[in-house]
């Protein structure tokens, strides 16, 4: 299916590009998320008329993400979990826990789908580096300090 991208999509293209994707990817993800439209003649004409407006919105989103990344880079988030004597956690720290901790710390815009944990879930006490993907071009590094509570 031919689609017009309404914003930058990772591994696919930039705003305004006409790309070919699988039908299911377009119908089930890109179009419902308002990241793309079908590439019909009418849609292309309408897009060209609204191009400047869409580019302005994209620039505002990018600027907001960069401002948040400046505040978030190097931020240390402390999370307490019940742990055993050997330092292993009862359970684990997930991206949802990190996102909730960031929300409580005042970073309301960070959602769990934006938190990337390179080594998977955290299962031991210690200091870990986690990434927050705020925009296709903006990534912030957050230090997560996992402290153990005696059970």
UniProtKB/Swiss-Prot annotation:
Keyword Magnesium: no
Pfam families tied to this protein: Ribosomal_L9_C, Ribosomal_L9_N
GO MF annotations in UniProt: rRNA binding; structural constituent of ribosome
InterPro entries found in the cross-reference section: Ribosomal_bL9, Ribosomal_bL9/RNase_H1_N, Ribosomal_bL9_bac/chp, Ribosomal_bL9_C, Ribosomal_bL9_C_sf, Ribosomal_bL9_N, Ribosomal_bL9_N_sf
PROSITE patterns, per the entry: RIBOSOMAL_L9
Top-level lineage group: Bacteria
GO biological process, alphabetically ordered: translation
GO cellular component, one term: ribonucleoprotein complex
Keyword RNA-binding: yes
Keyword terms: Ribonucleoprotein, Ribosomal protein, RNA-binding, rRNA-binding
Function, in words: Binds to the 23S rRNA.
Family classification: Belongs to the bacterial ribosomal protein bL9 family.
Name recorded for this polypeptide: Large ribosomal subunit protein bL9
Organism, scientific name: Bordetella pertussis (strain Tohama I / ATCC BAA-589 / NCTC 13251)
Organism lineage string: Bacteria, Pseudomonadati, Pseudomonadota, Betaproteobacteria, Burkholderiales
């Amino acid at each position: 299916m031919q689609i017009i991208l309404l914003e930058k999509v990772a591994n696919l293209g930039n705003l305004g590009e006409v790309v070919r994707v699988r039908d299911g990817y377009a119908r089930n993800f890109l179009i419902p998320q308002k990241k793309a439209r079908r590439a019909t003649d009418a849609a292309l004409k309408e897009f060209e008329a609204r191009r400047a407006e869409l580019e302005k919105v994209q620039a505002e989103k990018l600027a907001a993400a960069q401002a948040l990344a400046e505040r978030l880079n190097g931020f240390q988030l402390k999370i307490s979990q019940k742990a055993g004597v050997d330092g292993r956690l009862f359970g684990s720290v997930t991206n949802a826990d990190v996102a909730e901790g960031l929300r409580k710390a005042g970073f309301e815009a960070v959602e769990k789908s934006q938190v990337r944990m390179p080594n998977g879930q955290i299962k031991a006490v210690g200091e870990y580096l986690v990434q927050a993907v705020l925009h296709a071009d903006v990534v912030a590094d957050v230090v997560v300090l996992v402290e153990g509570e005696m059970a």
